[in-house]
Amino acid sequence: MEQKFIKIFDGLKRDYGYAEITNGYKDSTTGKFKVKHGWAGKQLTSADYLEHLKGEKSIGIQPCDDNGMVSFGAIDIDSKAYQDFSPRKYLEIIEKNNLPVVPVRSKSGGLHLYVHTKEKVKASFLRNFLDKLLYTLE
């Protein structure tokens, strides 16, 4: 499973994002779950992926490699009032339009929509697709 996950989320290798989810808190104004996050400052390894899959650490892969190519991308669907956010509206639009995305509930309570390609494409191409997708969902 680990190797398949690495292949599906193949992106920047020289660095990766992290989030300290065990030290998070809920923002009293927005209801959003907030965590300390940033760049790890080191190369991504198979061990990092495995620890992520085991739930031992939270990592974020930058989709764009050093050549400006991607095999996946994501958009974040958020609400200003997280406690009132319901993904149902978006899931219905995705299903009705047979959109090629994988919806995943985010740590903060929003929704991430992932799109994957069979081969690497220019990041700008996928970014344009995601922008149009976001417009469709609003």
Model-inferred region functions:
Residues 62-68, 95-96, 102-107:
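Short glycine/proline-enriched loop/turn "hinge" motifs that connect secondary-structure elements
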Residues 56, 94, 110-111:
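Generic alpha-helix detector with strongest preference for long hydrophobic helices that associate
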Residues 83-96, 116-138:
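Helical (often loop-to-helix) elements that flank the catalytic cores of nucleotide-handling enzymes
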Residues 1-72, 80-90:
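DNA replication initiation on ssDNA origins
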Residues 23, 67, 97-98, 128:
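Detector for Asparagine
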Residues 74-75, 100-126:
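Histidine-centered divalent-metal-coordination microenvironment in nucleic-acid enzymes
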